[in-house]
Amino acid sequence: MAENLSDQDCFEKLSSSKEGQHWFCSGLLTQYIQPTFFWFAHDETPSFKWVLNAYHERLRSCTSCIQAYYELRNESLAKGSYSFTGFSITDLQEKWNKWDIIRVLEDFKALEDETIDFTSLPCLIFETLLNPKLFTCKNIYKNAIDAFNGLLSDWCSNIFLPGYLLFFYEASHPDVLEWVHSFFKENTEIRISSATVDAVFNTVVFESQNSSDSDCNFVSISSPEFWERTYMFLELLPLQSITAACESILKDYLLNLVKTSESLSSQQMSCLRICCNSSSFWSAADSFKEVSSFLKNLLKNVTATPFEVSDMNWAYIIASFFRTCLNDFVSVFPEWLKGFVEEKRTIGFIIYSVLDALFDLLSLDYSSPSFLNNTLSLMNANSITILQDYPEYMLKLRLHSLLYDIAFISWSHKAITKNPSFVFDPSYELSPFWKLDNLQEEKISDVLFSKISSCCFAHDIEISENSTPSGTMVQFAELWQVMSEYISGFLKGFSEKSSTEISNMLGDSSKFDTVVSFLLSPTQPLYVSAFHIVQIITNCTKNRNEALKKLVAMDFRGIVHGLADAVLNWQSILSFFPALRIMRFLSITNKSLSSDNSAFTENDIPTLGAYWQCIWNILDLVFSNVARWSLNNPADTVKALMKLTLKFVDDLFQNDGIFIKLLAKFDSLILLGETSESLFSFIMWLKINDLELRGIVINSLCKLFTKFSNFDYLFEDRTVTFLTDFIIRKQKAHLSADQCKQLANVLTQASPEAKTVLEQHRLSEMRKTKKQTELTNSAHVIKPSPTPQITVKQNTTKSSSAPRMGMLEQLKQEYLTKRNFESKLKSSAVSSRKPTFNEVKPANLLAEDLSDNEDDIDRKQGLFSLAKANKIPEIRQQERRQVQLLSNSTIKMHPSQIRMMTNRNVANVKARLFPSMTDFYKEILSWEPANQSPNPVLKFHKLDGKIIDSFKTVEHYMEVLQPMIFMECWSQIQSTKLDLKFSPVEGIMVERTAVNNFVDIGVSVAPKDLYGYPLYDTEVVSLAFNKEDASSMKGLCCFAKVERIVRQTNGVLVVLRTLPSMEILNKLQGNCALWFLKLTNLATFTRQYAGIRGLPYFHLADDIIRARPCSQPVKHSSSEIKAAMKRYQVNEPQAKAIMCALDNNGFTLIQGPPGTGKTKTIIGIISALLVDLSRYHITRPNQQSKSTESKQQILLCAPSNAAVDEVLLRLKRGFLLENGEKYIPRVVRIGNPETINVSVRDLSLEYQTEKQLLEVNQGAIDLGSLQELTRWRDTFYDCIQKIEELEKQIDVARDVAEDTKSLGKELQNKINEKNLAEQKVEELQSQSFTKNKEVDLLRKKAQKAILKQADVVCATLSGSGHDLVAHSSLNFSTVIIDEAAQAVELDTIIPLRYGAKKCILVGDPNQLPPTVLSKKAASLNYSQSLFVRIQKNFSNQMCLLSIQYRMHPDISHFPSKKFYDSRLEDGDNMAEKTQQVWHVNPKFTQYRLFDVRGKERTSNTMSTYNLEEVEYLVNMVDELLNKFPDVNFTGRIGVITPYRSQLHELRRAFKVKYGKSFMSTIDIQTVDGFQGQEKDIIFFSCVKSYSKHGIGFLRDFRRLNVALTRARSSLLIIGNMETLKTDDLWGSLVDDALSRKLVESPHIDSEGRLITISRTSEKRMKNEEFVEPPSKKLANSEPSKEIRQRS
């Protein structure tokens, strides 16, 4: 022990410990540290100095050690105060405090001098917040305050309450005060000790008294602000913490003011008023004489001016004093008042004001109402007349009096029920106000009607037949008789109002709850009065059941709310007679629900869920308490309740019942989990001795088990164990063979473990029977071998031949026999069986382990023989449980296992988010820049074949797809080399560092050379020793990756990572000139590589490699789909897609053909996930959900910025909730602000971060600089938008051979303006943010906070892999990807790295696929999306959005038939909605093909064009414009073609025909460039004509689908029909148009057939390499009739 250790022993042990060992928090050296706290009593020795230094080192680096140090020191010195005699303990404490101050001050100075690491700062702040005494040092005070102010969000912990309280009195940092105030406001359950308050007040008082010697800026205790600050934190504390504060020196300060001051300030009065709520503020030692002077001064204001009823603080302060001495209030206070108050009315008012306050304070203490009996003697008819002139106060007093009676009756009934020997004052009299006629006065009636329900379950106390009621019971019965008559009369008076008036009043839920409560009352007059009210509002006076059914139909939600409140009230007494009434009420309610459950809508589901919870709570109470009730109530009545309950349970699960349907609406396991307690209580009824009831119990139990098993319910271990034991001991349980078999059958189906145990027992019994047969001559019975889990002893006691006792007799005797057997039972209660199924012994339940002796008692005494009849079970008053999933695990893991699992999870997350990228950069940086071959040379990755439909292992998947990244990257670099947009930049090499296998080269560059030269740390550049080599990438040149960019005062340092050859490395000498040229950005490729390297740790890894969607799609009923259609305002296919996305895990595929509302569906899914998913967390009506589930965050992605921003625009508008309110989710857009749509730029992370910084840190940022920064940033964005417009204009001008010099000059001016703006933004950001480390840290924290608070985070697929997202510890369980069919597979897996368990892919595989530059990669299926790969494997598990709202039916006819198996339907009235005036002209109808047999030509770029088609198309447009001059066609006409050369010719022709200005009214694009757009009229030029190479580009069915689905009202196709018919796909298009007589051609014969005039024999061609979309591969489709006939 520490007492026996010498100083030398302690020193040697401490000095021999390992370096860096944690001495305090580990607890290993406690006994050696404790004696050192007394060493300050002696002169300082070298040993002690060494120990102090060691302490200092450990307290500098570990917050846990700091906390343990103070606890250990205080504990040691406190113990030493009794035994240590060498020194004053107070002096010792003071010496340690001084050492702490010196130590902490040294560390702050060392931090400032940078002699210790910055990481010590948190420990210093931690200690100062923990120990307020440190604030007495002015330098510590200043440093700690400043540091805390800069890092506010890091210190949200109750550990620092001493420091937080101290900050309430800090005067120089209002922002700290505001933060601490917010912390207390948000954390409403803060617990503060009196010691904490003492420490804070001592510090503040010390500083106040020594203000001249201190720079610490605490408010003075003598100033009004001190009490204002005290009130500020007191009003935020719960009562428990106020009580603790009243046990501190704060109470002494206040009492001193009360006893010495003539008056108190308003701030002091406010503090005193709050403290008076605590019963510990005044003590019995505080005499009336001591405070009388204060009370007299307090009452001066009351007597001097007309009193106001509203301001009653003075009354509460006086009442708080008399709370501890009620006798003085009765005997002393009135006489004392007469000494200085003359008016009798004023005396009466003061007395009744204080009496009124006493009611409130005593109820706050949860005191017995009988404590006020003496004060009630003041309330008599004579004294009441004093207040007749003050009706408002008289009304309040009257209500208090009435409510007091209600509280007294309710409290007395509970007290006597729990303790029959309880005695209360028999002199109690009910209020005289009950006899007045004005109880129906609105102000009284409203309050009284809401409160009387608390005594609805009061009734005569239940006693056994042979017992004699006590005097208390008789007195209560008499009192209740009178009270019930009063209440009944009040209810009858209420029922005399008009039915309309009653209905309006019952619209208040509290009043409706009262009616429901009295419908459950066991007191007949009250029940009758309440029922009369029901008859009036339902207009049903004859049939009681019909009236109740109508009530349920009228307000089911109110019924459930009232029932729940009534049951909570009943739980506090759990008497028998209310149970009968409750069960009858439930039976009627259920019949009403089951008779017409079609009336219930989706909105009623939460209420039904709450009702379900309420039902099983009631059943649990009935099952658990029947044993106790049977002791004091007639047997027939108890049996009637049991039969009623059993029938009710059976009826719950009728096949057509409401709850069978309810289980399908929710996760059935969640709802059935509510039944676990009830089910275990129910199986105790198996021990009943009544044969009839036992049979009913077994049948009911078997039905329940069967129903639950159908829903895969996991029964609790204790339930299964009890039933298994019970079946094995069937003889002692009095079970017949059939009953055993019946129970065993359902049990084995429900539990495999039980099946194993019962089978082993059966085999054991067989061996036992055989053994006994062999030993017939033996004098004893050999015990059978034990079963593996349950040991069964052979009972040698012969059963009694006496007839079995009746149930009632047994239940009566149980009370007596239980005492006789109690000691015996205790000794035999230790079961010989082993625990089974992870069994945890239930606490305080009716059943215990079944020993032999207990079984004998069971057999003799029957039902509930194990209940402790002499002890009423404690009333369960727990808050109603929320619905939770049933936990399968009941075993606690060993701490080492927990640590291992935690470490493994952390490692997995790290591997998933931050895989090694070394091989990626090795591969790219090893490439030769001069190499111009189409494919790279791969040194570190091996090409391993095509992407197949399904992979078996992650490793194989990675081996195949990783090389695709490098082939695409190589192609990107080669493409950039052909069209260089930048020139090389010159710099000087200033540093060279070896990093692993790489060489990092620091190049110093002049800032002006980087203006307008966007360079990021993900760029790859060519690096050479001269400008020519860097540009041509020949000679001594290598690739380099930009590692980081450091802006310095004398230039910019660009650090380049390289893998140079020896020749280059040898030439890289100090200060040599280097040139680098920006080539391409590697961001997407690095994120793809990081994604695939982390794939083994993805939740969806197996689904990705096997390309499979959710394994078992959930089926939805028609009613659910209709409800979803109404909820989200969508059509049926969209509703199905939303529900599938909501219910399925894994991948969900939604195919959205053109115009079918993909975006609207996505918004519906987000709405369902963010808002409506809460319907699975059932709470009582009008009760706030307390779900502790983590925040649901959604990651929304798409391949392009435009697609992301399109959905974002819709999200920005918000969506409607079920109650009609608008909900706007918190949305954050991640990405380069340059690429984000202007309309949603305010949702960008950058914008929101700066906005938040401005709001929370105004003092740290110069407002002028910030405004200038905003102005330059706006200029930057405006320039980007203008540059995009100018580039489009130049593109068009070039096509029409127009001079672009002026446009080019304007473009260059805008580029220069943009570069200047970018330079200014960087400079201002550097000045405002990066120079201020604290603000820069706040910026990063703000970004993380914004991301964590977001409901939806939006980004491109590549952008979702941004490092900021990875480092923000975000977990997106749901990912939604729009346009998923346009993304390569490796892009799709990037957003899945954040723990995704649900991924919703939305797209259309029948439209254009992703663009892949590498022909080699494309040939290996790299251009195939993950969407398509999954579709190939599971085509029947796609949700098809099958209703289009874009095209006229004539236009949609062929795409629907050919590409969507005729399943693409038209929306309502689409023909009328798309009808246009030009349709009257037969040439410009909704859909038509024009046969133009021109000549195909090839341009220099090997692109095809057809001038005849150009001419024909221009003339058509001209004719359209001339024939309909009144129609404004601006922006309504689109011209598309598959070939870029044809695009140029078309633009040139229109320019010649109409001039330059016309080009802004018509949109001419390639088919690929027009995807995602739509126009009223589309002219489609096919180009191909008599080609030797077929129709080429046109053959891709996806391109054709895009082309045919862009038009809303008219689609006009111009092409050579003869050539087009040579292709199988296009031929079907021409044949379809011919059959519909929609082809205009001079080459059609009289029978409507196309005449062939080709000079070459052409046969219809079918592309062998590209397969047309088969009908079988459509979403959720079956083979068409045509296909089935062919097969």
Swiss-Prot record:
One of its GO terms (biological process) is termination of RNA polymerase III transcription. Residues 788-801 have a biased composition (Polar residues). Gene3D superfamilies: P-loop containing nucleotide triphosphate hydrolases. Its main location: nucleus. The keyword tRNA processing applies. GO terms for molecular function: 5'-3' DNA/RNA helicase activity; 5'-3' RNA helicase activity; ATP binding; ATP hydrolysis activity; RNA binding; transcription termination site sequence-specific DNA binding. It is an enzyme of class 3 (hydrolase). This is Helicase sen1. It comes from Schizosaccharomyces pombe (strain 972 / ATCC 24843) (Fission yeast).
